[in-house]
Amino acid sequence: MAHYSYPSPDQHSILIVEMDRVGTFQRCRVVPMDGKSAGTQVGPEGACIGGAWSPDNRWMYFNVEVDGSTHLWRQRAPNGIPEQITFGPTEQQGLAMGPDGKYLITSLGVRQSSLFIHDPSGDHPVPLEGSVSTARLSSDGKRLYYLVEKGNSTDAIELWSRDLASGKSDALVTGQRIIDYDISPDQASVAFTVKNGDSSQIFFAPLDRSLPPRLIAKDARFVSFGGNGTLIFMQLGEKTNYLARIQADGSGLERIMDAPILTKNAVSPDAEWVVVGGVGTGGAIRGTTAVSTRDRSRRGICNGPCLVRWSSDGKYLYVTPGTSIDRLTSSGRTLVIALPRGMAGAQFPPAGLDNASDEELAGVQVIRHGLISPGPNPQNYVFETAAFQGNLFRIPLH
């Protein structure tokens, strides 16, 4: 899907920033203005998030994340070799071409992230080594699980845990490039997705490392434990994705529903509901929706993308409006929705929680963070802060 477009000065071509079937930025693409072909990918292998043309139409410029760092690149049109033009520990976000083609303007700075535990006494930083992401609290709030990036993003992304009382950290799954995971309610097993090039596979492993990880499903992502020895995940197709379920031993693969989805979110603790997102029409999923795993009934939560999580006891729903599973921001807010009658009895605003008025949200607890993981109650949670601190610079072009 195309997100941003930059027409060439001669109006013959368009440089496009696009995402794949799971919402991940891909290489940029150049397509003809007349639409007679799908065009071709350009720039380096990586996540292209911005582009520009030189005024004379000879060069294309890209803002691309490669190996975990975002820099500026250029390529002679139409099929030259990509060249990196910025280097070093700082990164660049965004680019704009000067009117005379002699310089680029970009935001140059550094990315910073921190992890905090919140409890009734306040916020407490968690000292961890390495680049940490996807932190989650155990159901009892005593242990923290998280991913640690080793080297750059093409190397291993490992699963670790930390005992919050003793401060002791342990490696649980190493030597893999893990992009998402879920811990079983009894904290005995883990299911996780590994990224290998353009493909992704789901594995299952005991947390005591008594057995090696076992391959469960190919072309799959966003795995969660689904109760009764099952795993729920998003099955990736050529053009569409589906919500699927499989036994933890790899048997009994089945679709939960036939409607295609764009992404999968959380599964309720009782495995009765799963949250999915989509942009379909007619009978397809639209917005952010909870789907019953029993009778396929639906409950609309947000009109657009939202990140949704349940508390471990299922009594609260945590909803972060305006974000998706792959494009989270540390700003914004998370709504804590009480579920005294469970998900089936929940009442959501007709326009969705992302468009709710102050009156419709009266009495709802608001957490002033987007990247959170619920704890055993609304007063206990873990949150991540992530920010890019930079200033605008002019980059001369020679």
Language model segments and positions:
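Sequence signature of WD/YWTD-type beta-propeller architectures
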Residues: 1-398
